[in-house]
């Protein structure tokens, strides 16, 4: 239903039932947009939910609507806002913006002194990031931890990243520095 209320909130353990649906939608959405995205596993989504590092959107009837999660890097110096996805039938209703605001606030509350970054190829995410105070940066200004870059291996554009020595790719890196904001 179009007028059904959507609730955006921190994920709870019961939300692990959405993990398969979340990863399927992430992959199909990336294919439909023709953009690269690092593939996630259901286990990684469950891990984020169980660790209190995820935001979920659901209808009041318990239908999955959207998701995003955070991850820390370089010993907590950086936090990434990642995996923002909204189910196709609930897009263009402001859900992504609400999820983005919540995941940003979760990052700030859990890791107040960490720099927050987002790597995206989507204009909508770039606009949301800009509204929150993120600025475009080079890849050299975000996490350097090899584990972060290993996650890019499943992206269709990984060869571009490698050929550029992890200095740039087709995605835009955006950074929020709490010292400047």
Report the location of each language-model feature.
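Surface-exposed charge patches
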Residues: 21, 105, 127
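Alpha-helical elements of Rossmann-like donor-binding domains used by nucleotide-donor carbohydrate transfer enzymes
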Residues: 18-22, 44, 98, 102
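Terminal substrate-recognition subdomain of acyl/acetyltransferases
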Residues: 1-2, 84, 108-111, 117-181
């Amino acid at each position: 239903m179009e007028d059904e209320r959507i609730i955006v909130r921190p994920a709870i353990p019961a939300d692990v039932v959405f993990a398969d649906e979340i990863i399927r939608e992430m992959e199909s959405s990336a294919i439909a947009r023709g953009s690269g995205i690092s593939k996630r596993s259901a286990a990684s989504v469950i891990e984020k939910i169980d660790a209190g590092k995820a935001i979920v959107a659901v209808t009041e009837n318990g239908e999955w609507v959207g998701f995003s999660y955070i991850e820390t890097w370089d010993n907590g110096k950086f936090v990434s806002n990642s995996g923002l996805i909204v189910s196709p039938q609930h897009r263009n209703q402001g859900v992504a913006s609400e999820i983005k605001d919540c995941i940003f606030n979760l990052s700030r509350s859990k890791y107040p002194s960490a720099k927050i970054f987002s790597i995206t190829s989507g204009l909508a995410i770039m606009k949301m990031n800009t509204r929150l105070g993120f600025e475009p940066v080079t890849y050299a200004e975000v996490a350097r931890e090899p584990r972060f870059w290993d996650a890019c291996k499943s992206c269709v554009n990984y060869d571009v990243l490698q050929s550029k020595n992890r200095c740039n790719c087709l995605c835009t890196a955006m950074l929020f520095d709490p010292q400047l904001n």
